[in-house]
């Protein structure tokens, strides 16, 4: 049964309250731009509060102007995830036996570790085959994810990296494409599941949709995102490497994710309707 509005509000409020309580325990380190502490891990760039704020604002505006600037979206995610939200996500992993194993093992999702040729050989409806087919159809690679730079805590940096590398699995099990409309639907789902601010802020890109796309998003995909995002398990705790041979429908049901409206099929049907309407108009005008 889908959550009631009151239950949904309480769920989000509780997750945000957890973020606030965690934030009372963790604060930004104070230092100047001329006296930076040493990096906590390879590639780490310590930022002052002002620098973090400027990075958040600049990357937010830049990614709104060009939603395909994945580097800006990544920077926005890191700049707004601390000090509260990334710790909540880390603690969600610590509260789960599988999440703790992931934190201990530190697996990485790359084309080498996933062995894409093997995934393509798996049964048709398996998680691995579905994931590989989605990568091939969308023309993307698991190796394109940016490395985390701006999160100070080394363990939390891995949590953000893990979330980032799992994003394509979320696409695959839901079937949502990488077009703006599909990304917005997935980001809305991720926001309610992870409470990472960047995923919620990304919804501002809805202003870039065409009127028909925007109406479809708010009527179909946003309600789906709310239902599934609030009722599903914490996806950060899925050990995807161990699920590759499972049936994707069974896993989706186990995680509490409702299959979203098929965006590609909807767009295909609309194109056909527009084509028929145009042909009828041409016949009526005698052309």
UniProtKB/Swiss-Prot annotation:
Its main location: mitochondrion. Pathway: Cofactor biosynthesis; ubiquinone biosynthesis. Its cofactor is Zn(2+). Zn(2+) binds at residues 167-168, 171, 183. It is found in: Mitochondrion inner membrane. Its EC number is 4.1.1.130. It is a peripheral membrane protein. Lyase that catalyzes the C1-decarboxylation of 4-hydroxy-3-methoxy-5-(all-trans-polyprenyl)benzoic acid into 2-methoxy-6-(all-trans-polyprenyl)phenol during ubiquinone biosynthesis. Component of a multi-subunit COQ enzyme complex, composed of at least coq3, coq4, coq5, coq6, coq7 and coq9. This is Ubiquinone biosynthesis protein coq4, mitochondrial. It comes from Talaromyces stipitatus (strain ATCC 10500 / CBS 375.48 / QM 6759 / NRRL 1006).
